[in-house]
Amino acid sequence: MAPSRNGMILKPHFHKDWQQRVDTWFNQPARKIRRRKARQAKARRIAPRPASGPIRPIVRCPTVRYHTKVRAGRGFSLEELRVAGIHKKMARTIGISVDPRRRNKSTESLQANVQRLKEYRSKLILFPRKPSAPKKGDSSAEELKLATQLTGPVMPIRNVYKKEKARAITEEEKNFKAFASLRMARANARLFGIRAKRAKEAAEQDVEKKK
């Protein structure tokens, strides 16, 4: 590997006939063609289902650095499916991914994904298992004629940014200490239980003193 940026200049100590062990990438163009053919074969195999696979939930990226962005998750939580009125076993059969390990930590995420599931159900064209005997919930014959295979992602997720208009900075904003406030908030969250315990012990001691 060539030296990059302001690091130490390396002195590679090669042994073991390294020239016979150089990793080459001559298969890259053929690999690209193979991947494309595999995608096309899968799309033909699963038709008329969406080529990109089942619908995925909207999740927020972890850590402070990335939590302003949303992306596709692994699967919908059991709570989201329950609120949307879809059985977990049925969900997988109609192109909805399920992840039983996932937990909803906010009402907003739950509501957003429930809304996503309801919108998906309203747009879904469901083929009957037996064309001669359609069941309740299956799409009508007119809808089945309109069905085409979706090639892109199912209901793509977009990051929406709200642009704010330029305005004058207030005195309160100038005096606000962002880093100190974050440190204080973290400290308060960390020490919440200890402080509650101390307050309880102090109250008990006061009661004993009064006796």
From Swiss-Prot:
There is a cross-link at residue 174 (Glycyl lysine isopeptide (Lys-Gly) (interchain with G-Cter in SUMO1)). The modification N6-acetyllysine is found at residues 16, 177. InterPro entries: Ribosomal_eL13 (IPR001380), Ribosomal_eL13_CS (IPR018256). It is found in: Cytoplasm. Its main location: cytoplasm. The modification Phosphoserine is found at residues 52, 77, 106. Pfam families: Ribosomal_L13e (PF01294). There is a cross-link at residues 123, 145, 174, 177 (Glycyl lysine isopeptide (Lys-Gly) (interchain with G-Cter in SUMO2)). GO terms for cellular component: cytoplasm; cytosol; cytosolic large ribosomal subunit; cytosolic ribosome; synapse. Keywords: Acetylation, Cytoplasm, Isopeptide bond, Phosphoprotein, Ribonucleoprotein, Ribosomal protein, Ubl conjugation. Gene3D superfamilies: 1.20.5.110. The keyword Phosphoprotein applies. GO terms for biological process: blastocyst development; bone development; liver regeneration; translation. Belongs to the eukaryotic ribosomal protein eL13 family. Component of the 60S large ribosomal subunit (LSU). PANTHER family: 60S RIBOSOMAL PROTEIN L13, LARGE RIBOSOMAL SUBUNIT PROTEIN EL13. HAMAP family: Ribosomal_eL13. Component of the ribosome, a large ribonucleoprotein complex responsible for the synthesis of proteins in the cell. The small ribosomal subunit (SSU) binds messenger RNAs (mRNAs) and translates the encoded message by selecting cognate aminoacyl-transfer RNA (tRNA) molecules. The large subunit (LSU) contains the ribosomal catalytic site termed the peptidyl transferase center (PTC), which catalyzes the formation of peptide bonds, thereby polymerizing the amino acids delivered by tRNAs into a polypeptide chain. This is Large ribosomal subunit protein eL13. It comes from Rattus norvegicus (Rat). The gene is Rpl13.
